[in-house]
Structure formats: C-alpha cells, structure tokens
C-alpha cells in the first residue's frame, strides 16, 4: 500500500485522530499550566483553621466562618483538623499575599 492509497482510504480517520491528539494536548496544557491563583500556606504548631482565618481572612474579603468553610472544602478536610507541617490552600490570591509581605530575606540570613 502506498501512502496515497492509505490517505485516500482513511483520510477521515487520520484527520479525526490528529484532531483528537491536538485537542488533548491543548487540554493538558490548559489544566497543567493553569494552576491555582490562591496561596498555599504551611500550618505551624498550634495553628488551626480559625487561627489561619484570623490571620488571612482580611486579605480574602471573606467572613471568618466562610473562610474556614472554603478551606475545609478545597482541602478535603472533613473534620476541619490540620496538623503542623500540613500545607493548605487558602482563599487569598497570591498577588495579595505577596504585596502584603514587603520584607525580603536574603538566603544567607
């Protein structure tokens, strides 16, 4: 079979498969490249969701109860319990968190 004969016989299938591949690549790039605009914070010893709400709720324009509910839902915390060393996503945009932290620490300090 020559390429011309294969093309003439299966051109619809070839175009369909190539279209699916291209759309799949676009979808993967969109999902992977999109990322989250929300900040991720590490939980310290003695922290709770309510302590995080006290610290960050003002930057998120949410009431503290709404803040805690959002964090529980987005981080799949059914009982609302977090432990030191956990990392949780909070409803504060990364740009807001970066703007409020105006101090710069050098690597050797």
Curated annotation (Swiss-Prot):
User: Which GO terms of type biological process are on file?
Assistant: division septum assembly; DNA repair; negative regulation of cell division; SOS response
UniProt gene name: yneA
Keyword field contains Glycosyltransferase:
no
The record's family statement is: Belongs to the YneA family.
As for subcellular location, the record says: Cytoplasm
InterPro entries (UniProt xref):
Cell_div_suppressor_YneA, LysM_dom, LysM_dom_sf
Q: Which cysteines are joined by disulfide bonds?
A: none
Q: Could you tell me the keywords of this UniProt record?
A: Cell cycle, Cell division, Cytoplasm, DNA damage, DNA repair, Septation, SOS response
The terms describing its cellular component in GO are: cytoplasm
The protein's superkingdom reads Bacteria
Instruction: Cite a single Pfam family from the UniProt record.
Output: LysM
Q: Where is the LysM domain?
A: 39-90
The record describes the protein's role as:
Inhibits cell division during the SOS response. Affects a later stage of the cell division protein assembly, after the assembly of the Z ring, by probably suppressing recruitment of FtsL and/or DivIC to the division machinery.
- Identify this protein by name: Cell division suppressor protein YneA
Main localization is cytoplasm
The taxonomy runs: Bacteria, Bacillati, Bacillota, Bacilli, Bacillales
